[in-house]
Amino acid sequence: MAEEQAYHVNKGLECIKALRARPLDPLVVEEALAAWVETSEGQTLDRMSSDEAEADHQDISKPCFPAAGPGKSSMSRCHDQGLRGSNSCDEELGAFIGDSSMHSTEVQHYHVYDHSGEKVEGVEDADSILVQSGADDGVEVWGGDEESENSDVDSGEPDPEGSAPADWGSSPISPATRASDVETVEGDEIQKLLEDQSRIRKMTKAGKTLVVPPIPSQERPTASEKPIKKGTDVKSTSSGTMAESSSTGGATRPALKSQWGPSGPNASAENALASASNVSPTQGSKTESGTTTSRISQSNIEPEDDYDDELFSDIQDIKTALAKLHDDQQIIITRLESLLSLKGEIDSIKKQISKQNISISTIEGHLSSFMIAIPGFGKDPNDPTADVDINPDLRPIIGRDSGRALAEVLKKPASERQSKDTGKLGIESKGLLKKEFQLKPIEKKSSSAIRFVPDGSVASRSVIRSIIKSSHLGEDRKDYLMSLLNDIQGSKDLAQFHQMLVKILKN
């Protein structure tokens, strides 16, 4: 048993070290801790039920040695002084006390003897004294119904032979209790680690975190805390209380007959069980206690199932909200892309407008340099349009007086050019123009826009070279003609060469 305890302790310490080196997720640890609590509660109830069953069916005829407390001694007399002395009894008692590894959970039975070594008569009830080992607070003694009346042994009288009165000390702790202490310490360490881990996370995370609600407590509700309502077939409702049964086995207690008559439709009670006043203990107490334990553990699991369902629903709500946010984000991105396309179109329109502004400014510059001369003189005074003013919208474009340009090229002013005969207006106008503004007649012997007349100038030679280069003649003939042109001297020879070249090109 000691080896098993040491094994469990070592495993617990290894688990604690591993948890300190690599902390687990708080949710996983809480689930493991809840499962461990349910398992430990089930094991404790199983041990209690097994101890009670063993105490009921144990043969109490086996004698056991008493356990002496620390620092005190207990003396017992042997049954036969002739064969067994007090020294042998003391040796057996000392051997029992020295063996600290022997711890029995069985029921102990004691015989009462007088000082002479004879068994005391009339104390049959003393045989039913029971000592429960394994308790921490001491030994509890149960006696028979007539123990205080029939017993002749007085614990307060001193022993005439000088022996000290027997002092029954507390029995050592059972291995099962020690094992549960180790598990309790292990659970406390795990809880401490969880608290430290949560404190560190709260200090490190300053932003928003998802706070998981704590696991609801698994305390059993009392009869006064949770009133419930039960529906019936009629309109009235009856209030009741919800409480768990403390008994693990036995018969159903009889219920008192109600004094009130039924106010609604009757309910069938064919499957109701008959009540029993007395029930003998059965061998299936362990099974019943185990069933009750499983029911209790199942009732403890139900709040955790509700908690898991709530947590699952919260997670689903969060997922739905995230999906909706994703969809909204996609819509926003689509609209932003359309805005970017519109921005490109707007930029192209702005570029076109800037180009048009440049062209308009260029046209305005050209118009500002124009001088449009609108003749305003020489009109018939009887003409109804003679006194009509110029369109005011055209004044910035015209920029000059209507008769200013004409007055500058005439010899006489406009006041002196009034003619009575309208038929002679054109002849008089020609004579009135200044000589330097009059056009000269076209001469046939000089070059003009009508024809080309070569002379001995360099310009004439350049024109002939251009005619030869732009012709459809071959390269050899072009080179030959160019060499002849270079050898020609004088205007007459150049004119003859030009006539010959024209004939060659026409053919």
Swiss-Prot record:
Signal peptide: none annotated. Residues 304-376 are annotated as: Multimerization. InterPro entries: P/V_Pprotein_paramyxoviral, Paramyxo_P/V_N, RNA_pol_Pprot-P_XD_paramyxovir. Residues 236-252, 266-278 have a biased composition (Low complexity). CDD domains: MEV_P-protein-C_like. Residues 56-79, 137-307 are annotated as: Disordered. SUPFAM superfamilies: Phosphoprotein XD domain. This is Phosphoprotein. Phosphorylation on serines by host CK2 is necessary for the formation of viral factories. Homotetramer. Interacts (via multimerization domain) with polymerase L; this interaction forms the polymerase L-P complex. Interacts (via N-terminus) with N0 (via Ncore); this interaction allows P to chaperon N0 to avoid N polymerization before encapsidation. Interacts (via C-terminus) with N-RNA template; this interaction positions the polymerase on the template for both transcription and replication. Belongs to the morbillivirus P protein family. One of its GO terms (molecular function) is RNA binding. Keywords: Phosphoprotein, Viral RNA replication. It comes from the Viruses. Residues 459-507 are annotated as: Interaction with the nucleocapsid (N-RNA). Essential cofactor of the RNA polymerase L that plays a central role in the transcription and replication by forming the polymerase complex with RNA polymerase L and recruiting L to the genomic N-RNA template for RNA synthesis. Also plays a central role in the encapsidation of nascent RNA chains by forming the encapsidation complex with the nucleocapsid protein N (N-P complex). Acts as a chaperone for newly synthesized free N protein, so-called N0, allowing encapsidation of nascent RNA chains during replication. Residues 137-160 have a biased composition (Acidic residues). The gene is P/V. One of its GO terms (biological process) is DNA-templated transcription. The N-terminus consists of a long intrinsically disordered tail. The central part contains the coiled-coil multimerization domain (PMD). Forms a four-stranded coiled coil structure. The C-terminus constitutes the alpha-helical domain that binds to the nucleocapsid (N-RNA complex). Residues 189-199, 222-233 have a biased composition (Basic and acidic residues). Residues 279-301 have a biased composition (Polar residues). The modification Phosphoserine is found at S86, S151.
